[in-house]
């Protein structure tokens, strides 16, 4: 039971780190990156579909993104979705592809994005701490039900604390890396 609770908690913490990594990847830096379009959604035959799933996205130059839809008829819808997104970019429609030049970030916008990155990191840490709390509650229940002794549960709690610290530090590293990437001119 204890191993199962610990394994479950670690799996959920790993998922929280993965989600944080994806969230931080969507924050636009001064460089072109196909991942920045992962959260841009287009209505594709009645169902919301991410641009990344309905087009080929390439980065021919450090500040240029080229989007070529798999279906030419969707070009206008993709262009509109990108214009309406919070990315702050302006696509140029060349008939069969979209060219997007990534503008240089202002110092103020960089600071804003760093705050946003820190906020996403904090959300991930809260998620990890919530997983820890639920696992601690589960360990307390296991001990109360007499399924494990006090010593075993104590060791498991220490193990859980180490695991929590490991994943929180991973989040800190991700945020620090993103911050450095954003502040790099």
From Swiss-Prot:
Q: Name one GO biological process term.
A: translational termination
| KW Cytoplasm (keyword) present | yes
> Which SUPFAM superfamilies does this UniProt record tie to the protein?
Ribosome recycling factor, RRF
In terms of Pfam families, this protein maps to:
RRF
Indicate the principal place this protein occupies in or around the cell. cytoplasm
Q: Which UniProt keywords apply?
A: Cytoplasm, Protein biosynthesis
List the HAMAP family hit by this protein, alphabetically: RRF
Q: Report the family membership.
A: Belongs to the RRF family.
Summarizing the function annotation, the protein's role is:
Responsible for the release of ribosomes from messenger RNA at the termination of protein biosynthesis. May increase the efficiency of translation by recycling ribosomes from one round of translation to another.
Identify this protein by name.
Ribosome-recycling factor
Which organism does this record belong to?
Answer: Nocardia farcinica (strain IFM 10152)
């Amino acid at each position: 039971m204890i191993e199962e609770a610990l394994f479950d908690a670690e799996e959920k913490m790993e998922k929280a780190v993965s989600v944080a990594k994806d969230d931080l990847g969507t924050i636009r830096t001064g460089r072109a990156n196909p991942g920045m379009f992962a959260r841009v959604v287009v209505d594709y035959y009645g169902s919301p579909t991410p641009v990344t799933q309905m087009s080929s996205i390439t980065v021919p130059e450090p500040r240029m993104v080229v989007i070529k839809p798999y279906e030419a008829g969707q070009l206008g819808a993709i262009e509109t979705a990108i214009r309406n997104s919070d990315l702050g970019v302006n696509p140029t429609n060349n008939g069969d592809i979209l060219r997007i030049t990534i503008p240089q970030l202002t110092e103020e916008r960089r600071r804003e994005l760093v705050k946003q990155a820190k906020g996403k990191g904090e959300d991930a840490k809260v998620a990890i701490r919530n997983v820890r709390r639920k696992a601690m509650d589960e360990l307390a229940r296991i001990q109360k039900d007499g399924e494990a002794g006090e010593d075993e549960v104590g060791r498991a709690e220490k193990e859980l604390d180490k695991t929590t610290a490991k994943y929180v530090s991973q989040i800190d590293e991700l945020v620090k890396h993103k911050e450095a990437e954003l502040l790099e001119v």
